[in-house]
């Protein structure tokens, strides 16, 4: 007779069960750590994107507020009060006071060391007279051409009933607003020129986020500046009325969206695709998976 198979001893069974328990525990721990890591990286990636939206929109809002402060300061300047009212004034003194009040070379106006947010500003009084200040020097011939352009913009604006008026030309956006004296009576017009290069610099980090979009508009949806994706998605972005931070479907993808109103009727909208979060997780986790 053949001998029957020898049954495993209790010790062998115990070792097997112990090893099995260790392996299963290690697998469970590894899976748990992976899930926690993915959750952590996801939160971190989302936080980074939200910080970018908040930081960039904050920088833009700060510069628009600086514009508002400039315009408000004009009616409180004793020399410019007389100019705005069309009363007797010293032309040279008015120009100097206007340049000092607007101060286009201030840190508040600079996006970087070479890019002013406002590159030129004109103030017209009731009589159609003007003073101006500009960041870049101009030839006499070009100054005369610029004066004519701003006079035409002023004339077109005053024919409208709008509080604000916008025009884009030659990679610039012109923002027009009515100026009031201390009695809040309409006394003139201020025209501010914003250069595209400075605005592009302010939003330059969006190039690091594929498929991201941003859009700057006037109060009636006129596009002042936008990146290519922003132009493509302008209609859908402008349909979003609940401004602030939210998740919105734009095109075929979900996005982290920010929309906000600033001064002079200007609005900013930005959107970053949510799939950037997963792309960030992938790039972070991938080295450990190899």
What is each residue range found by the language model?
Residues 1-12, 40, 44-48, 162-166, ...:
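N-terminal sensory and localization modules of signal-transduction and trafficking proteins
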Residues 3-43, 47, 289:
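Extreme N-terminal signal-anchor transmembrane helix of membrane signaling/transducer proteins, especially
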Residues 47-55, 59-153:
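Extracytoplasmic/periplasmic sensory segments of membrane signal-transduction proteins
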Residues 103-115, 183-225, 229-231:
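Solvent-exposed, extracytoplasmic
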Residues 121, 177, 213-215, 221, ...:
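Generic short beta-strand
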Residues 133, 141-150, 168-207, 268-273:
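Conserved beta-strands of PAS-like sensory domains
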Residues 147-162, 236-249:
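Soluble sensory domains of the PAS superfamily and closely related sensory modules
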Residues 182, 208, 219-220, 228-288:
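Extracellular/periplasmic juxtamembrane segments that couple receptor/chemosensory ectodomains to their
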């Amino acid at each position: 007779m053949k001998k029957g198979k020898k049954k495993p001893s209790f010790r062998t069974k115990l070792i097997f069960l112990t090893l099995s328990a260790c392996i299963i525990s290690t697998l469970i721990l590894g899976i748990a750590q992976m899930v926690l890591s993915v959750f952590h990286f996801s939160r971190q990636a989302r936080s980074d994107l939200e910080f970018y939206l908040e930081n960039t929109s904050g920088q833009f809002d700060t510069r628009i507020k600086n514009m508002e402060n400039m315009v408000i300061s004009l009616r409180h300047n004793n020399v410019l009060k007389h100019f705005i009212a069309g009363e007797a004034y010293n032309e040279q003194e008015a120009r100097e006071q206007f340049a000092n009040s607007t101060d286009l070379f201030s840190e508040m106006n600079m996006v970087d060391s070479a890019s002013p947010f406002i590159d030129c500003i004109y103030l017209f009084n009731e009589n159609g007279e003007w003073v101006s200040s500009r960041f870049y020097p101009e030839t006499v011939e070009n100054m005369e051409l610029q004066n004519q352009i701003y006079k035409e913009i002023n004339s077109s604006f005053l024919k409208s009933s709008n509080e604000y008026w916008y025009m884009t030309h030659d990679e610039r956006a012109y923002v027009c607003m009515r100026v009031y004296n201390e009695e809040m009576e309409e006394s003139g017009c201020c025209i501010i020129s914003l250069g595209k290069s400075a605005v592009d610099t302010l939003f330059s980090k969006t190039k690091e986020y594929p498929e991201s979009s941003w859009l700057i508009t006037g109060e009636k949806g006129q596009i002042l500046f936008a990146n290519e994706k922003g132009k493509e998605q302008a209609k859908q972005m402008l349909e979003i009325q609940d401004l602030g931070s939210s998740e919105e479907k734009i095109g075929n993808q979900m996005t982290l969206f920010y929309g906000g109103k600033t001064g002079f009727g200007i609005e900013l909208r930005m959107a970053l695709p949510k799939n950037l979060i997963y792309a960030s997780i992938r790039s972070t986790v991938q080295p450990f998976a190899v």
